[in-house]
Amino acid sequence: MFTINAEVRKEQGKGASRRLRAANKFPAIIYGGAEAPIAIELDHDQVMNMQAKAEFYSEVLTIVVDGKEVKVKAQAVQRHAFKPKLTHIDFVRA
């Protein structure tokens, strides 16, 4: 079972995303179900180590946002073209 700590994003857009990536974080989103989508920011190194395992893509993950646990599955993962970096992940509620 994977547990990821996340924060709700305060800013959105290209500039805000670039600032996140410069701070070793990256943007993500949680959507699906009856609730509204949540734009979040994740720690790059924590998620990079988790996604190296194949189970990250097949198991239900737990994301802790503001103390509330959300069960999700990784839907789409975007990577940098030539650097070993994640640029964005879409999570769908499980």
UniProtKB/Swiss-Prot annotation:
It comes from the Bacteria. GO terms for cellular component: cytosolic large ribosomal subunit. The keyword Aminoacyl-tRNA synthetase does not apply. GO terms for molecular function: 5S rRNA binding; structural constituent of ribosome. Signal peptide: none annotated. InterPro entries: Rbsml_bL25/Gln-tRNA_synth_N, Ribosomal_bL25/Gln-tRNA_synth, Ribosomal_bL25_short, Ribosomal_L25_dom, Ribosomal_uL5_bac-type. One of its GO terms (biological process) is translation. It holds the Pfam family Ribosomal_L25p. Coiled coil: none annotated. Keywords: Ribonucleoprotein, Ribosomal protein, RNA-binding, rRNA-binding. Belongs to the bacterial ribosomal protein bL25 family. Part of the 50S ribosomal subunit; part of the 5S rRNA/L5/L18/L25 subcomplex. Contacts the 5S rRNA. Binds to the 5S rRNA independently of L5 and L18. This is one of the proteins that binds to the 5S RNA in the ribosome where it forms part of the central protuberance. This is Large ribosomal subunit protein bL25.
